[in-house]
Every structure is written in structure tokens, then in C-alpha cells.
């Protein structure tokens, strides 16, 4: 079965995602679409607005199979996020990766990716890093086509292309142009399409404008948001107060002694936004700092990093997805495709299970990896 992979967060799923899924299948001539989706925490360093099980139900209105991107990858920068996602795609025997982009020019994106790859492998690049220059500054100063690198989707697209070139060069790639909205738009300005940011803003402010920009058949799933970033603060504060700086230094992307800044400012903050204003620094982006805080919340340490894919968690599927899963199990009998958690898979998925428990602890949700079977959509 010819397959196309979509690397996603669906936070939440909307008409733009449905368009992307439809165009991905059409342009790749694929029989099946597979979403590699972040779980309960997302790349911007926040909990997802709805839990992964509800977002899987939403996603199955547009794709055939949904698998979980591990938490450590979901809370990583674009390069590692992309690298791990492409490894998952390769594990799933995906033929084509289709990603959203602000430009409909795959050759231009591939050219930028090739130039960055060459730069990263040069001794000059290593010298600049040793001199204390940031990766972002080096790329900004030495890569010509900066217009490509001004938008989040293009940056991720370039990261996917780089990862495919290094991990699975046989995977094809397609760029699907975004429709009518910018990634960070906070308002719904179009009759049919809106960014995830704008939809979250509408949901949080109890505005009904989101109802026009999500698929009609899943509107009923958009209930009160499950969890907001601000609700995590007291749990993060407890974790920082109860650990030493030495313990915090082992958190996955903690670096440059940032743990001391976290410790010295935590007593003076009573909410998430105030704390962020106290600890922000030119050394790190706002999003990077938020990811570090979520890694503290989930206790994801450097020792949790694993370069290998040892199994993939299946969250949901329709009939075509079930057929593809049968194909995978027959074609790759030694690979682990987890539909229900048992002793072996629980050890493998410990960070994802923990992330769900913590998400539920804060939000009051009940669905977890043990009491929620794989979601089957019988309509599509």
C-alpha cells in the first residue's frame, strides 16, 4: 500500500489540516495517510489543548492511521523533532512525507536544506560554535535565502528534508502550501481556514468563530479545553523547589547553567507568565525555555535520550489503517507496533505513560494509556 506521512500536532485539528491531509494523498497518489502526532505536550512547550485521545478522534476525520510521536521528541527543537519523526516514518515504511509550507517550492526548500547540511559538516561551522556563536545566528549569517527561514513551517520543512537525506533518502517529500492564514495568527480572519493559534485563542475566550473553521463532523468534540499552560505552573514550581540545581542540570535540554537561574527566581513568581518574565534571557528563545519547563514537569532527563526507534504507539485508525497495520506486522515481524499497553510496551513507553498521567493529574481528565483502547473510526 502506497503511504504518505504527515508530521503533526493537531492542536487542535481544523480545516487547514483536513485540506493538508486531502492534498497529501492526492499529490502523492497514496492509498493511506498516516499522522505522526505529538502526544499530550507539544513543541511550543505547552500541554496540548485537548488530550491525545480526543485529538486522535479529530484526526481520524482526515487521516487513516494515527501514531504517537514520543514526548522527548515533541518537546525538542525543530531539528531533533524532525529527526525523530522521520525515524518513526521510516519504521512505518512510509513512502512520502508531505508537510505544510508558506511557499509551494520544494526545490527551494531542498536547496536551503542542502546548504545547511554542508555548513554543519564544515570545520568553519564547528569553530564558530566553539567560539560561542548560537546555531541560529550562524545559519542567519551564512545562509543566503533567509526568506525561507522566516516562517515556522518552512523551518520545519527544511528540517524534515535534512533528516530524510540523512536517515531515509528513499522517502519522497512534498510541500503543501498553507491556505490563507499565517502560523501565528491570533484572530480568525477567513471564512474557512484559521491557524491553530487563532482557534485556541477563540476557544479560550469562549468565542464561537472557531465553529466555521473545523470539519463539521467533529465539531461536537471541541468541548471545554482540557488543559492550559498556566495550570501547570504550581506543579513546575514544586518540581523546581524540591530539586537541587545538580538534579535540574540533568533535565533533557538544560544547558549553560540555566538551572541556577530557574532556582533563583522561582520563589518570586506566582504564575507562569510572571516566572517567564523573570527567567527570560537572550541566550534562549521563549519557546526553548517553555520546553525546558515542560521537561522539568515530566522529569525528562538527558539519560532518557534514545536515538533508536524501539516501537511505535498506535493511537487510532480506520479500516484502511487497520489493513496497513496488518501489512506492517507481516512485513516487519520483529518490529513493535503497540495498540494495547502490556509489561513490555509499558517499559518502552514510560515517558508517554507518565506524560499522560501528569496531564490528567493537572486537568482532571481520566483517559490514560491503560484504560483507553486504540481508537477505531468505522465511518471512514
Swiss-Prot record:
GO molecular function, one term: ATP binding
Reactions that this protein is recorded to catalyse: cytidine(34) in elongator tRNA(Met) + acetate + ATP = N(4)-acetylcytidine(34) in elongator tRNA(Met) + AMP + diphosphate
Pfam families in UniProt: HIGH_NTase1
Keywords: ATP-binding, Cytoplasm, Ligase, Nucleotide-binding, RNA-binding, tRNA processing, tRNA-binding
Binding site for ATP: 7-20, 100, 153, 178
Keyword rRNA processing applies: no
Domain of life: Bacteria
Any GO CC annotation of this UniProt entry: cytoplasm
A biological process from GO: tRNA modification
Annotated compartments: Cytoplasm
EC number: 6.3.4.-
HAMAP family linked: TmcAL (MF_01539)
Family note: Belongs to the TmcAL family.
Summary of the function given for this chain in its UniProt record: Catalyzes the formation of N(4)-acetylcytidine (ac(4)C) at the wobble position of elongator tRNA(Met), using acetate and ATP as substrates. First activates an acetate ion to form acetyladenylate (Ac-AMP) and then transfers the acetyl group to tRNA to form ac(4)C34.
Protein name: tRNA(Met) cytidine acetate ligase
Taxonomic source organism: Staphylococcus haemolyticus (strain JCSC1435)
Amino acid at each position: 500500500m502506497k503511504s504518505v506521512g504527515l508530521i503533526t500536532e493537531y492542536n487542535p485539528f481544523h480545516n487547514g489540516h483536513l485540506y493538508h491531509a486531502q492534498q497529501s494523498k492526492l499529490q502523492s497518489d497514496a492509498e493511506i495517510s498516516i499522522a505522526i502526532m505529538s502526544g499530550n505536550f507539544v513543541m511550543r512547550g505547552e500541554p496540548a489543548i485537548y488530550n491525545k485521545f480526543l485529538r486522535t478522534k479529530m484526526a481520524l476525520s482526515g487521516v487513516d492511521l494515527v501514531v504517537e510521536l514520543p514526548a522527548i521528541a515533541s518537546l525538542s527543537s525543530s531539528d531533533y523533532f524532525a529527526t525523530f519523526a522521520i525515524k518513526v516514518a521510516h519504521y512505518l515504511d512510509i513512502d512520502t512525507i508531505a508537510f505544510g509550507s508558506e511557499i509551494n517550492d520544494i526545490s527551494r526548500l531542498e536547496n536551503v536544506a542542502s546548504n545547511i547540511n554542508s555548513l554543519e559538516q564544515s570545520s568553519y561551522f564547528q569553530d564558530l560554535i566553539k567560539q560561542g556563536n548560537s546555531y541560529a545566528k550562524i545559519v542567519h549569517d551564512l545562509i543566503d535565502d533567509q526568506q525561507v527561514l522566516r516562517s515556522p513551517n518552512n523551518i520545519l520543512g527544511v528540517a524534515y528534508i535534512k533528516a530524510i537525506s540523512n536517515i531515509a533518502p528513499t522517502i519522497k517529500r512534498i510541500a503543501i502550501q498553507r491556505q490563507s492564514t499565517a502560523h501565528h495568527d491570533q484572530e480568525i480572519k477567513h471564512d474557512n481556514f484559521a491557524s491553530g493559534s487563532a482557534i485556541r485563542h477563540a476557544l479560550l475566550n469562549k468565542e464561537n468563530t472557531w465553529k466555521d473553521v473545523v470539519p463539521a463532523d467533529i465539531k461536537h468534540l471541541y468541548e471545554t479545553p482540557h488543559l492550559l499552560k498556566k495550570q501547570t505552573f504550581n506543579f513546575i514550581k514544586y518540581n523546581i523547589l524540591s530539586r537541587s540545581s545538580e538534579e535540574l542540570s540533568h533535565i533533557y535540554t538544560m544547558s549553560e547553567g540555566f538551572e541556577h537561574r530557574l532556582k533563583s527566581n522561582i520563589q518570586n513568581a506566582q504564575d507562569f507568565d510572571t516566572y517567564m518574565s523573570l527567567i527570560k534571557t537572550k541566550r534562549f528563545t521563549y519557546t526553548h525555555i517553555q520546553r525546558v519547563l515542560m521537561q522539568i514537569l515530566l522529569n525528562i532527563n538527558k539519560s532518557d535520550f534514545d536515538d533508536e526507534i524501539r516501537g511505535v504507539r498506535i493511537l487510532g485508525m480506520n479500516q484502511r489503517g487497520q489493513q496497513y497495520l496488518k501489512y506492517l506486522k507481516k512485513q516487519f515481524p520483529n518490529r513493535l507496533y503497540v495498540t494495547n499497553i502490556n509489561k513490555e510496551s509499558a517499559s518502552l513507553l514510560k515517558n508517554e505513560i507518565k506524560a499522560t498521567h501528569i496531564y490528567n493529574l493537572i486537568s482532571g481528565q481520566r483517559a490514560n494509556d491503560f484504560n483507553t483502547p486504540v481508537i477505531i473510526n468505522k465511518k471512514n
